[in-house]
Amino acid sequence: MNETEKEHLKKVYTAYYSQIDFTKDFCEQNIKHITNIQKQPTYCNTPLFKFDGKTTALVYTLYSVSQICTDLLEHIENEIVRLSEVSEVEND
């Protein structure tokens, strides 16, 4: 691999890591926010134990977003490990 290719690859990795960091922060903030909301005694002025349509939909939506973010964070961690392994191989 010549120097131009290495520089290009470095820029690609830098941009990719930047996007990973942004996504990771976004997911962590969503999970934190959802956790705080779920600690509240009511959603939309409706007791959590009274599962009307609005409350039930909100609870499931928050759970779904939280689960998506958790899954995405796991994928990001795996991708970081994979990229570091690829980087080590290329540096050898």
Where are the language model's segments positioned?
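Sequence/structural signature of long amphipathic alpha-helices
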Residues: 1-92
